[in-house]
UniProtKB/Swiss-Prot annotation:
Any one GO molecular function term: NADH dehydrogenase (ubiquinone) activity
Keywords: Cell inner membrane, Cell membrane, Membrane, NAD, Quinone, Translocase, Transport, Ubiquinone
Quaternary data: NDH-1 is composed of 14 different subunits. Subunits NuoB, C, D, E, F, and G constitute the peripheral sector of the complex.
Membrane topology, from the record: Peripheral membrane protein
InterPro entries assigned: NADH_DH_suC, NADH_quin_OxRdtase_su_C/D-like, NADH_UbQ_OxRdtase_30kDa_su, NADH_UbQ_OxRdtase_CS
Protein name: NADH-quinone oxidoreductase subunit C
Function: NDH-1 shuttles electrons from NADH, via FMN and iron-sulfur (Fe-S) centers, to quinones in the respiratory chain. The immediate electron acceptor for the enzyme in this species is believed to be ubiquinone. Couples the redox reaction to proton translocation (for every two electrons transferred, four hydrogen ions are translocated across the cytoplasmic membrane), and thus conserves the redox energy in a proton gradient.
Catalytic activity: a quinone + NADH + 5 H(+)(in) = a quinol + NAD(+) + 4 H(+)(out)
Pfam families the UniProt entry points to: Complex1_30kDa
Similarity comment: Belongs to the complex I 30 kDa subunit family.
Subcellular localization: Cell inner membrane
Main location: membrane
C-alpha cells in the first residue's frame, strides 16, 4: 500500500508542478494540500485528468485550540479529573473563555496549522482504485471563503451548505448557499470552537404568550463533561511524522 501511495504521490507532484501543493503520506493515505486560489482548478483536474469521479464527503474544520489539552496525563497523578483538569475552551468553566493553544505541563504542543479554517474533501477514483484527501485552508479567518465545486461534483451541494451552516465557511459560486441544519434565525455557527457548548439561547413554551419563545441561556451552568486529552499513542506516530514525509510540488 505504501509503495502504491508513493507512486501516486509522484504522479500528483508531476501533474501539479508550479502550484502551491503539498503531498503527504500519513498512515499510508495520500493527502493533497492546495492553496485556496488553486482549489477549484485542482479539483477539476483531479476529476478530468486523474479519474476522481466521486466526491464522497466534504467537511469544514476549525483548528482553533488545536494541540491543547485539558488534563495532564503525561505522568501518573494522584489527582482525579475534578481536581486535575484545566478548562481551555469556550464555556467549559466560565463564559467568555477563549480556546487556548497551550498544553499541560509535560506535554508537547502540536504544530499549529497554517490558518484557522480548512475545507477537506474525500475523493474516490473507481477506475484506479484510489482514494485521495484534498485539504484547503481559507485565507481569511474573519470571513473564510473558498470556491464552490458544485459544478465539478454536483453531489457536494449539501455538504458545502452544511460546512457553511456549522462553520461559517462561504463557498463562492454555490447556487443556493443557505443553512441546512440549524433553525430559522439561528445566530452563529455551532461547530466553531468559540461557540458556547450549550448555545446562546434556550427554548421554552410561554403560557402567557401561548407560543414557543427564545431566551438567553440561564438554566445551565458551564461544565466539562469529557476532558480533551492528548496522549502519546503509537497509532498517531505516523501523523506526527507527516511533515517529514511531505513534499511540495515544484
Amino acid at each position: 500500500m505504501a509503495e502504491q501511495a508513493s507512486s501516486f504521490t509522484d504522479r500528483l507532484a508531476a501533474r501539479f508542478a508550479g502550484a502551491q501543493i503539498a503531498v503527504a503520506l500519513p498512515r499510508g493515505e495520500v493527502t493533497l494540500e492546495v492553496a485556496a486560489a488553486d482549489w477549484h482548478a485542482t479539483c477539476l483536474a483531479l476529476r478530468d485528468e486523474l479519474g476522481f469521479e466521486q466526491l464522497s464527503d466534504l467537511c469544514g474544520v476549525d483548528y482553533l485550540g488545536y494541540g491543547s489539552d485539558e488534563w495532564d496525563t503525561a505522568d501518573v497523578s494522584s489527582q482525579g479529573f475534578s481536581r486535575g483538569v484545566e478548562g481551555k475552551a469556550v464555556g467549559r468553566f466560565a463564559w467568555g473563555e477563549f480556546p487556548s493553544q497551550e498544553s499541560s505541563a509535560g506535554a508537547q504542543p502540536q504544530q499549529l496549522p497554517k490558518q484557522r479554517f480548512a475545507v477537506v474533501a474525500q475523493l474516490i477514483s473507481y477506475q484506479h482504485n484510489q482514494r485521495l484527501r484534498v485539504r484547503c485552508y481559507a485565507p481569511d479567518e474573519q470571513v473564510p471563503v473558498v470556491a464552490s465545486v458544485t459544478d465539478i461534483w454536483p453531489g457536494v451541494n449539501w455538504f458545502e451548505r452544511e460546512a457553511f451552516d456549522l462553520f461559517g465557511i462561504v463557498f463562492d459560486g454555490h447556487p443556493d448557499l443557505r443553512r441546512i441544519l440549524t433553525d430559522y434565525g439561528f445566530v452563529g455557527h455551532p461547530f466553531r470552537k468559540d461557540f458556547p457548548l450549550i448555545g446562546n439561547v434556550e427554548v421554552r413554551y410561554d403560557d402567557e404568550r401561548k407560543r414557543v419563545v427564545y431566551e438567553p441561556v440561564t438554566s445551565v451552568e458551564p461544565r466539562v463533561g469529557v476532558p480533551r486529552v492528548i496522549r502519546d499513542d503509537a497509532r498517531y506516530e505516523t501523523a506526527a511524522g507527516e511533515v517529514g514525509k511531505s513534499e511540495t510540488a515544484k
